């Protein structure tokens, strides 16, 4: 920090060790994150830095432009309009269900574009399908080579196939992008429509076999396998059977099996695998923006709910309440602090407040206070960690906020009522999974006058049949 000049004069070796640590960390991060960009820079007409900064749409367009300029052919103008169709997403069962199989159509949109002769109307040279077919062949060849490769070579090949995959997956988006030179909204809609019909066909086959579809999400289906389909081998065989029912070039892959699933809402669920690992999708249950104790509580409560351990849920809730009341934080202030990143300058923030465009916010007020105390300029992108302390009745949130480093475990001053209320808010996320509001309140309440009895408390599973599926599909 500010003492670096003094440390350099007094202990230069310490600074050199610090710098070497930075270089080592950067190299290791680059090894994990930069491989695909390195190989992309060999394919697209961009230097490495530009390839790292630009999005996939710009890379695809650069390939098209290079091909057309090389052929001395004029470039088309972007088509005006918008895409109408989208991916098929829906949820048919909410609650705790299992076992679960996840089947997905491998490379759904690229497979459709290759097998249904999709290309933009403005692509006079037919470059779209040729590039897509070439990249797909390169990716499959690279993935095949990975199977027998050693660790270092395998990592290099994986970076290559990832770079191919990133480009391949961008072709569909390019069709529906309003500013792309080679866009074609009608073709983008056709791809999405075929994708929807393929997924409806998969759903229909699963239901006809006796399975229960939980959720469909653009290119995959989560479902309870039919009676008699038990175990890894049988589940894989069932998915292979689904693949055999698809048109040529469309393959359904087995993408995982799970012991239980907590289905919350569309694109928001938790999966418990057979090794006890918990996987979350979406942010409705667990969000990175909430306090650390809240994330931990939701994860632990979800694991217990998946096991249908009602007594354990009640004990967990009471344990967190006691810890908050007793200022017993496992990781100190990091357990309950909030961390926010400043997205505007302090001047812009103050102007918006004065113009009633936004209320005062704790992070900005504390950042301004820090700037006054240190005499330095507070910049956009700085992070502010804070908590809410006990305050007089009627105090606004930003007035009760304190910087996290001010919290003293020997004299804790965080607002216990506020953090108890936060715990109740986290617990409220589980109310939809109980049969009645009374059942929910029994579990997430400290009122144990006659002792807690989990018997009679029922979980709720709501199921609706998938929409009536058309018999006609485009294959």
Predicted regions and their residues:
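Generic non-transmembrane alpha-helical segments
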Residues: 198-209, 237-245
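Catalytic palm subdomain of template-directed nucleic-acid polymerases
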Residues: 221-236
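Common nucleic-acid-contacting/processivity interface regions adjacent to the catalytic cores
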Residues: 6-107, 111-114, 154-197, 201-205, ...
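A residue-level signal for conserved active-site and pocket-lining positions in enzyme catalytic cores
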Residues: 22, 26, 139, 168, ...
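C-terminal, non-catalytic extensions of nucleic-acid polymerases
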Residues: 233-475
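Conserved catalytic alpha/beta cores of large enzymes that bind or transform nucleotide phosphates
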Residues: 124-164
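Short beta-strand
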Residues: 212-217, 254
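Cytochrome P450 catalytic domain signature, combining two hallmark sequence patches
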Residues: 117-126, 236
